[in-house]
Each structure stands twice: as structure tokens, then as C-alpha cells.
């Protein structure tokens, strides 16, 4: 018995159009909603880069941010940990994080609470004061070509974090 190692399905013209349309919609969906925050955390875009105004930290310095989706495109994402305006490496001029009350985060916990896995394709930057970075997603994390700027330490965790005394 001979097994072909290269399988090439034969599609009709309408089948090829259908496949092309499906891929077009999938591509637009991935670009349209990279990061969807819940609660105090907010997201906007500047120069195609997602800017995340992280939640105000606790007295111990933990900024606990929850998301329905946490994906980073090739354009990147910036986590705003700044008390004053300045220049981001990825997004240019940014203002201070409006959620802060005089204290920056020492640990930025990014927790995905939905059924969506995370796809990290680009750089992430902690703008302002350097902090520890944690991405926790029990549904999985694919990291392909991404990096993290201005982080003291970084952890990608496939699981659900437990926070105590945070």
C-alpha cells in the first residue's frame, strides 16, 4: 500500500471562494479584539498598539487585571504603569494611568477569566515604572515572537492564579 505524503484537496471554484472568505473573516476577527478587559482595567488603541490602563494596585503593589481576551498582535501592547506622561517605546507619547492614585504596581497580574486561549505575537511593554509581569490563562498561551520590555521578571502561567494578601 502506498501512502501519499502530500494531500492536496480539490475544491471547486465556489469552494475556493468560501475558504477565502472564511480566512478573511477570521483574520479580521483576530485584529478587531486583541484585548478585552473587565472591570477597572481599560483598553484603547494608539498607532495600532493596544494601550492597557491597568487597575490601581493594592497597598502591597498588586495590580490584578481580568480579561475576556488577552491577545497581542504584531503591533504590540503597552501596560500603563505610569504616574506621569512620557514616551512609550511602542506607542509614542502616553499620559499617566488615570486609574492610579499616587502608587504604581510592582506586580501586574493579567488573568484571563473566559474560555479563550491567549496568542502573543508581538512585543509588550510596561510603560512607566518597571514591574513583574504575569499572564495567567487556564485555556492556554501560545507565544510566538513576542517579548516583554521593562519587566523585572515575567511569567506565563497556564492555570488560574490564587491571590492572598495581595
What is the meaning of each model-derived region?
Residues 2-16, 21-166:
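Solvent-exposed adhesion/ligand-recognition segments of exported proteins
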Amino acid at each position: 500500500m502506498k501512502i501519499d505524503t502530500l494531500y492536496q484537496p480539490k475544491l471547486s471554484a465556489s469552494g475556493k471562494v468560501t475558504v477565502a472568505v472564511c480566512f478573511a473573516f477570521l483574520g479580521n476577527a483576530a485584529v478587531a479584539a486583541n484585548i478585552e478587559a473587565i472591570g477597572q482595567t481599560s483598553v484603547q488603541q494608539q498607532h495600532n498598539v493596544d494601550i492597557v490602563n491597568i487597575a490601581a494596585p493594592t497597598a502591597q503593589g498588586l495590580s490584578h487585571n481580568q480579561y475576556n481576551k488577552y491577545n497581542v498582535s504584531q503591533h504590540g501592547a503597552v501596560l500603563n504603569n505610569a504616574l506621569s506622561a512620557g514616551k512609550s517605546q511602542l506607542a509614542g507619547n502616553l499620559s499617566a494611568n488615570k486609574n492610579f492614585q499616587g502608587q504604581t504596581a510592582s506586580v501586574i497580574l493579567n488573568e484571563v477569566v473566559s474560555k479563550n486561549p491567549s496568542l502573543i505575537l508581538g512585543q509588550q511593554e510596561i510603560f512607566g515604572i518597571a514591574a513583574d509581569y504575569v499572564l495567567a490563562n487556564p485555556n492556554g498561551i501560545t507565544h510566538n515572537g513576542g517579548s516583554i520590555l521593562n519587566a523585572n521578571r515575567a511569567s506565563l502561567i497556564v492555570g488560574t492564579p490564587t491571590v492572598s494578601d495581595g
